[in-house]
Curated annotation (Swiss-Prot):
Domain spans labelled FAD-binding FR-type: 269-531
GO BP annotations listed: cobalamin metabolic process; folic acid metabolic process; homocysteine metabolic process; methionine biosynthetic process; protein stabilization; S-adenosylmethionine cycle
Reactions the enzyme catalyzes: 2 methylcob(III)alamin-[methionine synthase] + 2 S-adenosyl-L-homocysteine + NADP(+) + H(+) = 2 cob(II)alamin-[methionine synthase] + 2 S-adenosyl-L-methionine + NADPH; 2 cob(II)alamin + A + 2 H2O + 2 H(+) = 2 aquacob(III)alamin + AH2
GO molecular function terms listed in the Swiss-Prot or TrEMBL record: [methionine synthase] reductase (NADPH) activity; flavin adenine dinucleotide binding; FMN binding; oxidoreductase activity, acting on metal ions, NAD or NADP as acceptor
Residues annotated to bind FAD: R449, P450, Y451, S452, G485, V486, C487, T488, W695
UniProt keyword list: Amino-acid biosynthesis, Cytoplasm, FAD, Flavoprotein, FMN, Methionine biosynthesis, NADP, Oxidoreductase, Phosphoprotein, S-adenosyl-L-methionine
Cofactor(s) of this protein: FAD; FMN
Gene field: Mtrr
Sequence positions that bind FMN: 10-14, 93-124
Official protein name in the record: Methionine synthase reductase
Modified sites of kind Phosphoserine: S171, S188
Subcellular location: Cytoplasm
Region described as Hinge: 166-245
Highest classification ranks of the organism: Eukaryota, Metazoa, Chordata, Craniata, Vertebrata
Amino acid sequence: MRRFLLLYATQRGQAKAIAEEISEQAVSHGFSADLHCISESEKYDLKTETGPLVMVVSTTGTGDPPDTARKFVKEIHNKTLPTDYFAHLRYGLLGLGDSEYTYFCNGGKVIDKRLQELGAQRFYDTGHADDCVGLELVVEPWIDGLWAALTKHFKSLGGQENMSDTLSRASDAPLSTAMKPELLHIQSQVELLRLEDVGERDSELREQNETNRGQQGRIEDFDSSLVHSVPPLSQSSLSIPAVPPEYLEVHLQESLGQEENQASVPSGDPSFQVPISKAIRLTTNDAVKSTLLLELDISKIEFSHQPGDSFNVTCPNSDREVEELLQRLQLADKRAHRVILKIKTDTKKKGAALPAHVPEGRSLQFILTWCLEIRAVPKKAFLRALAEHTSSATEKRRLQELCSKQGAADYNRFIRDASVCLLDLLLTFPSCQPPLSLLLEHLPKLQPRPYSCASSSLRHPDKLHFVFNIVEFPPSTTAASPRKGVCTGWLATLVAPFLQPNTDVSNADSGDTLAPEIRISPRATNAFHLPEDPSAPIIMVGPGTGVAPFVGFLQHREKLQEQHPDGKFGAMWLFFGCRHKDRDYLFREELRHFLKTGVLTHLKVSFSRDAAPDGEEAPAKYVQDNLQRHSQQVARTLLQENGYIYVCGDAKNMAKDVNDTLIGIISNEAGVDKLEAMKTLATLKQEKRYLQDIWS
């Protein structure tokens, strides 16, 4: 068979699943995929690779390559590498991203760009799949086209076609080869800012997204639902994926009664069990969202951190949802049985391996509670597998529709956008009775949840604060009862017995109630820290819980000023926003204290739901409105005083709006056009003077 090297760079398993799908399909097209995680550098060597390379690369954080690709990215960015280092290499790359974030698909773009700079050439156009509208809209046609591109590549090696023809489509690389080397990175950053009037590829993406939304809109005109389709889909012949090969053999053994706890959860990072020493409600009871602050006692562990860092919290699934799942799977009487896994001897799955996130010999209840993401939105391959275990012909057909090419719009509307999970499907399709092995094959690892540090170790030695909203999901057509966020709901229940009402954080007492413990682990360090030069002015933009790291910044700066009374410290601006002044103004007293003492130079607060008193000017509704009102000072800080700007909070709307506002401010105040303003902002990002800590 014709061999190609297939590498994936994954953060949460999405890229791995797609790469495995490519590997499975390869055989039927006459190819053999040599599949590896990009971090397994001992198993491949791109410098001597003779076969074509196919890569699937995800994006994490604010446009970073995934953790598994960090070493690879660092190595290929070695400045001593010659420009023909990869001249022998022919590749195709599929990037995964989310257009709700500013730096869409940047993980893939960084690698794609560097491979080009080192002489590699594409045998197949790069794909950019958007999780905002559905990865499969790009992933499926990209995989379909891959086989023809590979066939053409191998034919060209045999002299049947001219290599230049094979590679002609690679000539549309986004960066001009005539561009000066020092401008390459800036130009790349500008491209990734994704303004609507710049970039041919982005316009194509938007057209594709609009087409998809149009498909969904047409469906809404009919009485379709998760369980029911309408013409033309209900009458169409379906193109559905092949049934994923089963590969796990599961045995349930009666337990000997061993004790199980969080420490049994597999983790690649060092983790620590720490007590919660304080819990405070920061919002009033009538606030739209409930926001809590938790204080952790880290005095017994080595856990160094600084303001701007984040850390992971290991959390379980909801007890109620686990119980419902056990009942629905008819396994409630075996909840305490130990789960023993083996690879099926006759499996057709290439490279089948036991899931690393399922510990050996743990109880079924423990695995469903601590190891599997039972809230995960099922991928189409999972739906296809579930259809094979559905006895009702009507229900089976509907599951097949939802995983078919023809049913892509229905999948987006009723599965992905509705955040439907396995339990929802099993309750909606009562004749579906999958074996436990299928769940263990398809449910991903229950991921720890990241939180920003909201305190300084200088102000609170041996303590660690973090802040979160209790995420709540109202009842829906698939979930009859309301649900809370997996981690935030669990934490809220955990601290309910000793939760203190809205109060000044610094004056809150540690309760006498026995403190529950949670497991935390450090995350990779980032650049979201105070400047090394304390005299540099900074602008902080953080509405809602996005203010958390900035409270840590201010605590840290206050202590530094106390320790160095003659030191020179730059101005600190904080743009904060909330809904109501009297309900969810987080850290109000502490922020006023910082303003009074001069640690905080300017505090600009916007209230999106409060009306202006009679006769007064309407207040700014959002943080970007306040930025615009102070555009001269913002521009002077960034462009003349070498200042820094930090943005923390929601990626979907706020971060984009702030980014657009900054471009407008630079354009107006510096008297340059939009493109030049984008270049300036890209330079700030490259210099790590424009930093983001955002989430969706």
